Amino acid sequence: MSVSLSKGGNVSLSKTAPSMKNVLVGLGWDARSTDGQDFDLDASAFLLAANGKVRGDADFIFYNNLKSADGSVTHTGDNRTGEGDGDDESLKIKLDAVPGDVDKIIFVVTIHDAQARRQSFGQVSGAFIRLVNDDNQTEVARYDLTEDASTETAMLFGELYRHNGAWKFRAVGLGYAGGLASVCAQYGINAS
């Protein structure tokens, strides 16, 4: 049975899904009606060390870097429309393969070309992040984002993190007005 999380809520994967080794993180959204400009939202993951920063640029997993160097995190590909039901983009994580010096994996969604297209998360509805046991396709946890993010062009949906040697997932829902560049700057990536 899936755990429904509120903003800030967390769930222990060792208690909820003790045998889970492979995680599918599904992210979804719907674009509200716009002036005709296409909406292209992009999911990404950042592998963070204890200092809250990436160890190097290879720890930024996105549509131009689909797999971490160690193979522990894989982006399944870019969906340029976000149309249809279910997950719009997803990432797969092999928990046992995540390097020991990675404390946290954050999952971010950004709006491509948001400034030029004058788009924000205020024009996005039905946004969610869900964790699925990729071995048996059972949904473990889900967070439906309900915040009004009228100026934000990037959103940290959720994070997997180590706590006392076990993995946990937290629903975050933190918006960034500066888009992907501001997220990258915060976590140690030079996005210029």
UniProtKB/Swiss-Prot annotation:
Any matching Pfam family: TerD
InterPro entries hit by this protein: Stress/Tellurium_Resist, TerD
DNA-binding in keyword set: no
Origin superkingdom: Bacteria
Gene Ontology BP annotations: response to tellurium ion
Keywords: Plasmid, Tellurium resistance
Keyword Cytoplasm assigned: no
Disulfide bonds: none
Gene3D superfamilies found in the cross-reference section: sav2460 like domains
Annotated family: Belongs to the CAPAB/TerDEXZ family.
Function: Not known; seems to contribute to the tellurium resistance (Ter) mechanism.
Entry protein name: Tellurium resistance protein TerD
Gene (UniProt): terD
